[in-house]
Amino acid sequence: MHGKYEAPKSGKGGGAAILIIALAVLVVAGLGFAAWKLLGAGDRRVSVTEPSTEFTTAPTTEATTEPTTEPTTEPTTEPEPVYTNPLNGEIIDGPFTKRIFSVSINNLQDSLPHVGTNSADIYMEMFVNYSIIRGLALYTDPTDVPAIGSVRSTRVIFSQISRLFDTVMIHAGGNGSVLANAKERGVESYNIDTWDANNIYSFRDKDRSRQGYGWEHTLFARGDGIVEEAVNRGIRVDQDPDKDYGLCFTEDGTPENGEAATSVSLTFSFNGSKKDTTMVYDEALGKYVYNQYGKSMVDGATGEPEAFKNVVILLADMEFVIHGYHQADFVAGGEGYFACGGKLIPIRWKADSEEGPLRFTTLDGEPLLLNVGNSYIAIAAVGSPVTWDTGSSEAE
């Protein structure tokens, strides 16, 4: 039997179903209107927020490379040059360009005391002929020294020293043969024992004359005047700043391995003539005080002790030349002694040539370091006795 689908017939059951459907449509429509009203009348657009597709990324830390710092080269600064006085080692403002002045100093007992020798950078003592002993004072700048002397005549050995240091030699005349010898050596010098009406470069000490000094012991040089007079005479007073004077200095020249030498005694001895000099160390002064003729020397103008930072004794081959005047072999050199700060060592010395410079060395050949300050230099014949401290050591 075949079944047959038939549409439901109208009746009560069918009407109820239709009513339910109609009500559902109305409800849905009402809800839709309410939603429209909420969104804005007449505006059917709906703002839809789409889900964000962005995502949080952890902050990226880039590897930071420190900027490459090129090594900076500081501009090279040349050290400021240090200029020193060639005869005393003291610091000066600029290159040394002055010519040294040397003055012949009377050293006979009757002529004492000296005047102005404490202001010399170097004071030398030596036999000059037979038994006559004199001094030679060297000044890098004599202009501040009001009086120097007393002044006596020049000698051959003074001309030798003048050539070693290229000095302007100041003297009170001299033997004709000695003056001729100086000229042959190329020494520039002049005699201050001449008519100087205005006392520009020299004067006679009237007080000495009244005190009974001999006329030959009363002549003095004026430091500023001798430079002025040299200029007036056309004598060169400047110097090559690169000139080598041969001397080396340090702030403390006390010999490290030296023997104690609270006093140093030298007996100048040549051809039967003798003269004693003793240098006595004064710890308070830090200098050796000059003693001769049984007494300590003082400056006749200031009353200050005549004292020196350095004591140098040069034992030289000596000979007679030109009527008994002495000459030393500076180029051959020899041995000697150096005392400073209360100690003493043996040394060697020689000049490079007759034009210098004069050099001092230790026994092992190192340059001798003098203490900054003034120096006493004795030039004595080989064989002149030297003793120090208790006299237990002697050089013959």
Where on the chain are the PLM-derived regions?
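Extracellular mucin-like PTS domains
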Residues: 50-79
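Gram-positive cell-envelope targeting signals
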Residues: 1-60
